[in-house]
Design a protein with these regions (language model features):
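Glycine-rich beta-strand-to-loop/alpha-helix junction loops that act as flexible
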Residues: 8, 89-92, 208, 322, ...
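Phosphate/pyrophosphate-binding loops at sites that engage ATP/ADP/AMP, CoA/4′-phosphopantetheine
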Residues: 69-84, 190-197, 312-323
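Short beta-strand-loop/turn "lid" adjacent to the catalytic site in phosphate-handling enzymes
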Residues: 70, 74-122, 143, 149-158
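Glycine-rich phosphate-binding loop of actin/hexokinase-like ATP-binding domains
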Residues: 150-255
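Catalytic phosphate/nucleotide-handling subdomain of diverse soluble enzymes
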Residues: 218, 224-256, 265, 329-360
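Adenine-nucleotide phosphate-binding core of ATP-dependent small-molecule kinases
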Residues: 265, 272-276, 283-318
Length: 398
């Protein structure tokens, strides 16, 4: 059995897999670590949700709480912690050092720590998760699966920024991209689903959730992606601006008297759908506001879909054509309107959506293009945890 952990700055999500059947036998998450009112929310085997409140000052206490819950006589899923063969971690930023999943040891963790500058919120939290497991279960192998790894196949002309080269040499400033585990999972899964060989396929994967990114994939390898050095580049997101003129950033800093922390906060947490609409960062709430005729919400929605559409066109050019356009992520999987609006007007590229099929699809694997459509448009729900568990298993076998 494999335990998958995703440690954020104030949260830990977990899933326990039985790898013989690939089934999730326990799952849940801890929220508000280090804050008042921290709790663990778990899904019982019968699908019932349960909330356990507990003071969780830091990640080690959280991991311990999760492990104790897994063997709890009432809500547990296993009899003893010995049943866990390994732990797989979602690691956010692996820099240029990691292009595939690895067994975590001292040397690997030192190299990962060296990437902290690149993801100051996420990487230290990921490390806390690893250290917490080491403290409680010192003999269990742990595997790191990096969000940036899949994108390491991008060519240099796609990942370099047009800035003085020494900034790349000194600080590693370049495009890295994120959601890599999701893009890798869905691009592989869509080929299985359609019964095609990944070699020879040109695929554009759209991971649209609260954060959003698109990847251009050729022969199963990533050639380009919308997020950059940080997850702030590319699409318009729930609270992130996505692409913005760097000159506008310095202009705003000057006018508003903002320092780097202030401007980072503005662009990461107060912009995007929330900033434009003034309503919410949640697309469901935005939808409701649009239906109520709120002009700012309508503008935000138009901008949101337009950006996605524009990148699909750009990546079709970068790939020299496209065979499959894929939607995943919370919004991509569940909101048919988003898929419809993004694909509207792309008939010239051979993209034709079957509206009656599209309207019915919420979180299921499905082809939503018409039989006549030259490009297959497909919805594939992402399963990053399953891929992390599979990678962990593969590394264990080695």
């Amino acid at each position: 059995k494999i335990l998958v952990l995703n440690c954020g700055s104030s949260s830990i999500k977990y899933k326990l897999f039985d790898m013989t059947s690939k089934e999730v036998i326990a799952q849940g998450g801890i929220e508000k670590i280090g804050l008042k009112g921290s709790f663990l929310k778990l899904t019982l085997p019968n699908g019932e949700k349960k909330i356990l409140e507990k003071d969780i000052p830091e990640h080690t206490v959280g991991v311990e709480f999760i492990l104790n819950t897994l063997i709890h006589p009432e809500y547990g899923a296993i009899k003893s912690l010995d049943e866990i063969n390994a732990v797989g971690h979602r690691m956010v930023h692996g820099g240029e050092r990691f292009s595939e999943s690895v067994l975590l040891n001292k040397e690997v963790l030192e190299a990962f720590t060296a990437c902290n500058d690149l993801a100051p919120l996420h990487n230290p939290a990921n490390l806390k998760g690893v250290n917490a497991v080491s403290a409680i279960l010192p003999n269990i192998p742990q595997v790191g699966v990096f969000d940036t790894a899949f994108h390491q196949t991008m060519p240099d002309y796609a990942y370099m920024y047009a800035i003085p080269h020494e900034l790349y040499e000194k600080y590693g400033v370049r495009r890295y991209g994120f959601h890599g585990t999701s893009h890798r999972y869905v691009s592989k899964r869509v080929c299985e689903f359609l019964g095609v060989n990944p070699v020879g396929q040109k695929i554009i994967t759209c991971h649209i959730g609260n954060g959003g990114s698109i990847a251009a994939i050729k022969d199963g390898k990533c050639m380009d992606t919308t997020m950059g050095l940080t997850p702030l580049e590319g699409l318009m997101m729930g609270t992130r601006s996505g692409d913005i003129d760097a000159g506008a950033v310095t202009f705003i800093m000057e006018k508003e008297g903002l320092n780097t922390t202030g401007v980072s906060n503005l662009l990461n947490k107060k912009s995007g759908v929330l900033g434009v609409s003034g309503v919410s960062s949640d697309m469901r709430e935005l939808d409701a506001a649009c239906k109520a005729g709120n002009p700012k919400a309508i503008l935000a929605e138009k901008m949101y879909y337009y950006r996605i559409k524009k990148y699909i066109g750009a990546y079709a050019a970068a790939l020299g054509g496209v065979d499959i356009v894929l939607f995943t992520g919370g919004v991509g999987e569940n909101q048919s309107l988003c898929r419809e609006e993004v694909c509207k007007g792309l008939e010239f590229m051979g993209i034709e959506i079957d509206k009656s099929v599209n309207d019915k699809i919420h979180g299921d694997e499905a082809v939503i293009s018409t039989p006549a459509s030259k490009v297959k448009v497909v919805v594939i729900p992402t399963d990053e945890e399953l891929l992390i568990a599979s990678d962990t298993m593969d590394i264990l076998k080695k």
